C-alpha cells in the first residue's frame, strides 16, 4: 500500500511487570490486523539471551525450536508470527544477544573497527540497529519488533537503547512503541491495580522511551475508570489504553484488539494508508473455533509434556486440523515413559481417537514411544509420527512385523547389531563430538517425491512436496527391503531416492498410519491446516464415530439380554 516519508514504519513491542504476558501473541494479532487492512507486514523477535540460537537449549527451559524455511533455529514466537500472518519468515526474523556479540567480536578480530575500543554503545547497539533495519528488505509497510524479556532486565537494555536510537534516526513519526503490561486483580479487595503498570512505564522512561500505547493484560476486562487512570499516570492518550483480558482461544485476540481500536490507533499515529479490516477469512476460522460439529481426543505422546510449549506448533497444528474438519480437538498429554509396557499403553491410550508422536532427542522415553505406536498399529487407532516419531515407527515395525528383534537407532545404542535408524553420513563428526552441535543438523526446507498411489500423495494432492527438517539420523537403507516386505510402505523419499521421508501402512491394514521424517507442524496455519494433520483429525472423527456406534450397539445388546 505504501506510506509517506520513510518507506517502512516500525512498531516496537515491549513487556513489563512479569514475563509470559503474551507479547508475542499481542504482536502477532496486531500484525494480522494490519495485514487484513491491506498493509504489507513483517515481524522480528529480539531475544536478550546469550545463546546464538535456541537450537541447543533445553526444551524444558525454552520450549520448542521453530525452524524456518531457510534452516534457522528460532524462538517459538516466530511460529506465532507465521501462523497469524500466514507468511513464511526467514532466519533474520530472530535476533539474539549471542548472534549480535558473535558478529561484533568477529568484526573486531578482522580489524573492521580500525582499532576502536569496542563497547556496548555504539558497537553492540549499531549491530542491533542494522538487524532491525534489515527487516525493511522487501519494502514492508510495517515492521513489528518484539523485544524479549521484561523492561528493567539488564539483558534487554541494549535492545531498548537500539530501538530508541532507531526512532531518533528515522523520525518519531515512523516509530510506534507498544507496551504490554499486567494489571492484576486482587480478589480479597475486588480491585484491579495499576501501580505495577505505572512502575513499568517509569522504568521504560528511564531508558528514554515513552510508550505510545499500552495493552493491559488481565484476568477480566478493564473498565473506563482504570483506563483513564493509566492514561493519566502513564501519559498516553485515552484511546491508547487497550484492555486485553484472557481469551478462551488465542485466535480471538485480534477481534479483542480491534474492538478496543488498537489497529486503528496505530495506523492513525503512523499515517498509514489503509482500508477497513477484511474479516472474511478470520470470521470463517472463528466460526469453526466456536461451533465444532464433532469432538475428538488426540493423545500427544512426548518426552517434554511438563512444558506444553515444547510442542507448541504440534498442538496448534492439531487444532488447525480440527478447524479444517469442524471438530474440536482435545489434546491429552501422555508421558512417553508411561507407554513402555503394553498395559501402560492401553491404560493411557484407550480413550484416544488418534495418537501423535512428535520429535525429540535422547534415549529417555523412546521405548514408550515405540509402545504407543505398537498400540496404535494393533488397535487401528489413527497415528501420525513426526521426525523421531517416524524413526520409532520404523523401529516398531522392524521388531514386531519384520522380526528384527534387536532393531534400534544408533542414536540410542551405538553398538546395536541392527541399526534400522542410522547416523547420516554428514552428521558423523557432530555425533562423535568432533564438530559443533549448534546449527549443524539437517535444517530447513527440503523437497520430497511421493509415490503416486500413496495415502500421503492423496492427502497433499501432489507427488512433489517441500517440508522443514531438523535431524541427524535417517532410516538405514540397508533395511528398506525387509521393512517393505513386512508391510511398511516407503511412500516418500528425497528426490534422489536416498533418504526416506514418509512411511505408511496400507489402508486395508490400518485406517491412518502415517509418519514423516519432517516437521510438517511448522508449516501448518490456523486458516490452512497441514494436510497430514487434517487427515489425522478426519481419521480421528471416523474412529470416534465408529467407537460411539460400537458402544451404542453393545448397550442395546445388554438391554435386549435383560
Swiss-Prot record:
Residues 1-272 are annotated as: Amidoligase domain. GO terms for cellular component: cytosol. Mg(2+) binds at residues 77, 146. Allosterically activated by GTP, when glutamine is the substrate; GTP has no effect on the reaction when ammonia is the substrate. The allosteric effector GTP functions by stabilizing the protein conformation that binds the tetrahedral intermediate(s) formed during glutamine hydrolysis. Inhibited by the product CTP, via allosteric rather than competitive inhibition. PROSITE patterns: GATASE_TYPE_1. UTP binds at residues 19, 193-198, 229. GO terms for biological process: 'de novo' CTP biosynthetic process; pyrimidine nucleobase biosynthetic process. CTP binds at residues 19, 153-155, 193-198, 229. It holds the Pfam family GATase. Its EC number is 6.3.4.2. ATP binds at residues 20-25, 77. It catalyses: UTP + L-glutamine + ATP + H2O = CTP + L-glutamate + ADP + phosphate + 2 H(+); L-glutamine + H2O = L-glutamate + NH4(+); UTP + NH4(+) + ATP = CTP + ADP + phosphate + 2 H(+). Residues 297-546 form the Glutamine amidotransferase type-1 domain. Disulfide bonds: none annotated. L-glutamine binds at residues 360, 388-391, 411, 472. InterPro entries: Class_I_gatase-like (IPR029062), CTP_synthase (IPR004468), CTP_synthase_N (IPR017456), GATASE (IPR017926), GATase1_CTP_Synthase (IPR033828), P-loop_NTPase (IPR027417). It comes from the Bacteria. Pathway: Pyrimidine metabolism; CTP biosynthesis via de novo pathway; CTP from UDP: step 2/2. Keywords: ATP-binding, Glutamine amidotransferase, Ligase, Magnesium, Metal-binding, Nucleotide-binding, Pyrimidine biosynthesis. Coiled coil: none annotated. Homotetramer. Catalyzes the ATP-dependent amination of UTP to CTP with either L-glutamine or ammonia as the source of nitrogen. Regulates intracellular CTP levels through interactions with the four ribonucleotide triphosphates. CTPSs have evolved a hybrid strategy for distinguishing between UTP and CTP. The overlapping regions of the product feedback inhibitory and substrate sites recognize a common feature in both compounds, the triphosphate moiety. To differentiate isosteric substrate and product pyrimidine rings, an additional pocket far from the expected kinase/ligase catalytic site, specifically recognizes the cytosine and ribose portions of the product inhibitor. This is CTP synthase. It comes from Cutibacterium acnes (strain DSM 16379 / KPA171202) (Propionibacterium acnes). The gene is pyrG.
Amino acid at each position: 500500500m505504501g506510506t509517506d516519508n520513510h518507506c517502512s514504519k516500525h512498531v516496537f513491542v515491549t513487556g513489563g511487570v512479569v514475563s509470559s504476558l503474551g507479547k508475542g501473541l499481542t504482536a502477532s494479532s496486531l500484525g494480522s490486523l494490519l495485514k487484513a487492512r491491506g498493509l504489507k507486514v513483517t515481524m522480528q523477535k529480539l531475544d536478550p539471551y546469550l545463546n546464538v540460537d535456541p537450537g541447543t537449549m533445553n526444551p524444558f527451559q525454552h520450549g520448542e525450536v521453530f525452524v524456518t524455511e531457510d534452516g534457522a533455529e528460532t524462538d517459538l514466537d516466530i511460529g506465532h508470527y507465521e501462523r497469524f500472518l500466514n507468511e513464511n519468515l526467514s532466519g533474520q526474523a530472530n535476533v539474539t544477544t549471542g548472534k549480535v556479540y558473535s558478529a561484533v567480536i568477529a568484526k573486531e578480530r578482522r580489524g573492521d573497527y580500525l582499532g576502536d575500543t569496542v563497547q556496548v554503545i555504539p558497537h553492540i547497539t549499531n549491530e542491533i540497529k542494522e538487524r532491525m533495519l534489515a527487516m525493511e528488505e522487501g519494502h514492508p509497510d510495517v515492521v513489528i519488533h518484539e523485544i524479549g524479556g521484561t523492561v528493567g532486565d539488564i539483558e534487554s537494555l541494549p535492545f531498548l537503547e537500539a530501538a530508541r536510537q532507531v526512532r531518533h534516526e528515522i523520525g518519531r513519526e515512523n516509530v510506534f512503541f507498544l507496551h504490554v503490561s499486567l494489571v492484576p486483580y486482587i480478589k480479597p479487595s475486588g480491585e484491579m491495580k495499576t501501580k505495577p503498570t505505572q512502575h513499568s512505564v517509569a522504568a521504560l522512561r528511564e531508558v528514554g522511551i515513552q510508550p505510545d500505547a499500552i495493552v493491559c493484560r488481565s484476568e477480566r476486562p478493564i473498565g473506563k475508570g482504570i483506563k483513564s487512570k493509566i492514561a493519566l499516570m502513564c501519559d498516553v492518550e485515552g484511546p491508547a489504553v487497550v484492555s486485553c483480558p484472557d481469551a478462551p482461544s488465542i485466535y480471538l485476540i485480534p477481534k479483542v484488539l480491534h474492538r478496543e481500536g488498537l489497529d486503528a490507533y496505530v495506523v492513525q499515529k503512523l499515517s498509514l494508508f489503509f482500508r477497513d479490516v477484511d474479516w472474511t477469512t478470520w470470521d470463517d476460522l472463528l466460526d469453526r473455533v466456536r461451533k465444532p460439529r464433532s469432538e475428538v481426543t488426540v493423545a500427544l505422546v512426548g518426552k517434554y509434556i511438563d512444558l506444553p510449549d515444547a510442542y507448541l506448533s504440534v498442538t496448534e497444528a492439531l487444532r488447525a486440523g480440527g478447524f479444517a474438519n469442524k471438530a474440536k480437538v482435545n489434546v491429552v498429554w501422555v508421558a512417553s515413559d508411561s507407554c513402555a509396557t503394553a498395559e501402560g499403553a492401553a491404560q493411557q491410550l484407550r480413550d484416544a481417537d488418534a495418537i501423535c508422536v512428535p520429535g525429540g532427542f535422547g534415549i529417555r522415553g523412546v521405548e514408550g514411544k515405540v509402545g504407543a505406536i505398537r498400540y496404535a498399529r494393533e488397535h487401528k487407532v489413527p497415528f501420525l509420527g513426526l521426525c523421531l516419531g517416524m524413526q520409532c515407527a520404523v523401529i516398531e515395525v522392524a521388531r514386531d512385523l519384520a522380526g528384527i528383534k534387536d532393531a534400534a537407532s544408533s542414536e540410542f545404542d551405538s553398538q546395536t547389531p541392527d541399526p534400522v535408524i542410522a547416523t547420516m553420513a554428514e552428521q558423523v563428526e557432530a555425533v562423535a563430538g568432533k564438530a559443533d552441535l549448534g546449527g549443524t543438523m539437517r535444517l530447513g526446507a527440503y523437497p520430497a517425491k511421493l509415490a503416486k498411489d500413496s495415502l500421503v500423495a492423496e492427502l497433499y494432492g501432489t507427488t512433489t512436496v517441500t517440508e522443514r527438517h531438523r535431524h541427524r539420523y535417517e532410516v538405514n537403507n540397508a533395511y528398506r527391503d525387509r521393512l517393505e516386505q513386512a508391510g511398511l510402505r516407503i511412500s516418500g523419499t528425497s528426490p534422489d531416492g536416498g533418504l526416506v521421508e514418509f512411511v505408511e501402512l496400507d489402508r486395508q491394514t490400518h485406517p491412518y498410519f502415517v509418519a514423516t521424517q519432517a516437521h510438517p507442524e511448522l508449516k501448518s496455519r490456523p486458516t490452512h491446516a497441514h494436510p497430514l494433520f487434517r487427515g489425522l483429525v478426519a481419521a480421528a472423527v471416523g474412529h470416534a464415530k465408529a467407537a460411539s456406534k460400537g458402544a451404542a450397539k453393545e448397550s442395546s445388546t445388554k438391554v435386549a439380554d435383560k
